[in-house]
């Protein structure tokens, strides 16, 4: 299959690219700055694929730029003809009290995490709808279901992603297009290590003086390979059998499965009351 992965410069995206390429798929590994910031990551991924004789093409794509998205998708379609699977993985983390971020900083978090995947989906869905076939996998977070005090700028963007993805899951069923959500717990990846911190230092100091809301971070976070393995399993499943949500990891995931089950039941009850079908 022809598979597009965003945020493939490292972390989950790189591992997802490699496991799917090893499985025989044509993978379009996208990242921003392949001639600049991520030139080394792009070069290493290309060299790895060439050495393994696997079908990986590295493509420039900045999910916050509509022109970049349009150019990248056009290139993939010109090379491959169509896209079977999209994995929306590109993301940015943030930490600290919401008040410590400027509105522009909060907008940037949402632009990458939420609107970035919406740009991708709008670009690829016409082709999938025309073929009545396709799979969109949205990498969100357990913090898109749970709230921790100083992670909610990031968490809020993930909550929004969850809502958009679930809506698409139902909306695209008549076109036999699957939408699946992967919810990682705590993992050691460059995204979390490079989390955006609010620049309003005076406000940060005020919160630090009175709050004890910094969570105890896990000593042994889960292995990022678990996310790649979960994505592979979803890709391998027959169309129409994939679960809406898949929780991965053991840290920051307690209760998420139960929350998802309760949400699914509540949604079904609501739809039934409206004479609709999920």
For the regions a language model picked out, list residue spans one by one.
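Canonical Rossmann dinucleotide-binding motif of NAD(H)/NADP(H)-dependent dehydrogenases/reductases
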Residues: 1-32
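The beta1-alpha1 cofactor-binding region of Rossmann-like NAD(H)/NADP(H)-dependent oxidoreductases
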Residues: 60-71, 103
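Active-site loop-to-helix junction immediately N-terminal to the catalytic Tyr of the SDR YXXXK motif
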Residues: 101, 147-155, 167
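Active-site helix of classical SDR
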Residues: 121, 157
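Residue(s) in the substrate-gating loop at a strand-loop-helix junction
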Residues: 141
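SDR active-site lid
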Residues: 174-242
